Amino acid sequence: MAGQKIRIRLKAYDHEVVDSSARKIVETVTRTGAQVAGPVPLPTEINRFCVIRSPHKYKDSREHFEMRTHKRLIDIIDPTPKTVDSLMRLDLPAGVDIEIKL
């Protein structure tokens, strides 16, 4: 797999879960002998919602909610077959969304 690059994007609502998952991936990749660039923190996506508290009237009384999506980017340069195999077997938490591009 010479000259290839694997790009991994992690997304989660909890920043601690994303950081621990990124740490696990980096440790696994360095143990198998490939080079790692990252984890690079990407901008946090914030979705804000404004909701009227009352179901009927009192429009002046509103409540604000927000959802934060934390993202990290990891590049694996020149992965070995052992690296790919160990990444496939890696057990990560359920709250993390993982995108892998070759």
Curated annotation (Swiss-Prot):
> In which family does this protein belong, per the annotation?
Belongs to the universal ribosomal protein uS10 family.
Say which species the protein is native to: Salinispora tropica (strain ATCC BAA-916 / DSM 44818 / JCM 13857 / NBRC 105044 / CNB-440)
PROSITE patterns, alphabetically? RIBOSOMAL_S10
**Task performed by this protein:** Involved in the binding of tRNA to the ribosomes.
The name this protein goes by in its record: Small ribosomal subunit protein uS10
Which superkingdom, per the lineage?
Bacteria
**CC annotations in GO:** ribonucleoprotein complex; ribosome
Recorded name of the encoding gene? rpsJ
GO biological process entries:
translation
